[in-house]
Each structure stands twice: as structure tokens, then as C-alpha cells.
Amino acid sequence: MAVGKNKGVSKGGKKGSKKKVVDPFTRKDWYDVKAPNMFKNRQVGKTLVNRTQGTKIASDGLKGRVFEVSLADLQNEPDAERSFRKFKLVAESVNGRDVLTNFHGMALTTDKLRSMVKKWQTLIECSVDVKTTDGFMLRVFCIGFTIKDSMSQRKTCYAQHSQIKNIRAKMTAIIKREITSTDLKGVVEKLLPDSIAKDIEKACQVVYPLHDVYIRKVKVLKKPRFDLSSLMELHGDGGGKAAEVSTGAASGVVVDRPEGYEPPVQASV
């Protein structure tokens, strides 16, 4: 054993053992996450962020966060048709204690996708890159499965290669037609009832009967330059209170005062 003083014991233990433990949550604040006005439930949830300290601003830590929410929660309708679709919302601006979000993507849950794949049928899928009228570049994935005709006696319902190519071409054409003619808000409104997939299923019946046709995933590849006014319109604030306040301040308002009114004397200026 080494001879000499044990500095750690003489000082009462290891260095830093008496340091006070600070709860990290005391330095954080809660913010409300707000969904755009395309959805019925605007209050998505809450998120934590460190308070503004020095050069670290709290709003900068919130911007860019992605929240994944089930469509059933966004629409306040917990039915089976909505629960397996997940929407991604990205934080783009902070207004007071509200985090204003915008659409960032959509996908089906894994269990729904796995449950649709079965034997004795053909899986047909396609992906298309399309641009909306307001400059968003989206990659849209579509999936569908062949189904046995009611008059058929066969066990299987496999489509021929030429039929698969024809169906895939129809999928691509319908997706391009529906998305290139509208803005991002219109795309989301079409994704909510999945009207694009229903149009594809109806159009492909002449080639081969399909079922379980869905827009499987939507990715946002590119965005236009951030515009606060368009984001406020999505959240129902465009031309609202802020516009009224600015208009009133510019035009001036006549205020009734009692006779002999004198303004109060201020202690400091």
C-alpha cells in the first residue's frame, strides 16, 4: 500500500460530491403546438424547450421540430379509417406560447401496411415527384392490390405485366393531375378523405379490379421561401386581429373624455 496522505478522504470524499443537484425542468417552458386550420383539432399537444438565456433564444430551439400525430386525433374522430394514417407537422414559427406548424408529410402505420399484404394477389405501387402551385415539391407514394372478380372461379388474382404497367401509368397521371392543380392546403384537404386514392381505384377498374388503394406516403422534398403571412392564414390569423389593430392605429380613434379631464402626472418618463 502506498504511504502518504489520501487527499480525497481528508477533504471528505470525492471532488464535487457536494454539488447541488438542479432539476433540469426548472429551466424549461411548455409551449402549445397548434395545427393548421385544415384540421378540426387545432390543439395538438405541448412541447418543452429551454428558456431564453443569453444568445440562446427559445424560439430558435422550437423551429424545425417535427410532430407526428394520428389523423384520428387531428380530426377528433377515433374511427378505424383514420387511426392508421399519421400526419407530420413541422414547427415554422412561434407566436407567444403557441408553436405554429405546417404540413410536413403523411404515412400509413406499419401494422396497416403489413396487414394488407396477402397471398394470391398482385401488389402494385408507384411514386411520383410533383410540384404544387405554391412551390412545394412533394414525393407521393401510392399502393394498391388486385382483387378477384366476382365472376372468376380461380383462386388467384394475379395481374399481367402489361396490366400492371397500365395501372401504374393511371396512378401517376391521376396523382399529377390532382396535385399540380392546387396548393399545399388543397393537397392536405384531398389527403384527409383520401379522395385521390378513391379516384385511382375507380379509374383502374376497367384494367383490373383493385382494392386497398391508398396514398401510402407523402414526403416534402423542397419548400419555397418562408412567408409568415401565408402561415398566419393557415392558422386563421391572416387579416384578423393584427390587421384590425394596425388599421385602427393608422386611422385613429375618437375617445370620449369627461369635461375638465386632465391626464395623470407620471412619476418618470
From Swiss-Prot:
State which gene encodes it.
RpS3A
The name on file for this protein is Small ribosomal subunit protein eS1
Write out the function statement from the record: Has an essential role in oogenesis.
GO cellular component terms listed in the entry, alphabetical order: cytosol; cytosolic small ribosomal subunit
The main location is cytoplasm
Oligomer status and interactors: Component of the small ribosomal subunit. Mature ribosomes consist of a small (40S) and a large (60S) subunit. The 40S subunit contains about 33 different proteins and 1 molecule of RNA (18S). The 60S subunit contains about 49 different proteins and 3 molecules of RNA (28S, 5.8S and 5S).
Q: Which residue ranges does the record annotate as region Disordered?
A: 1-20
- Origin, by domain of life? Eukaryota
A biological process term (GO) from this entry: translation
Organism, per UniProt? Answer: Anopheles gambiae
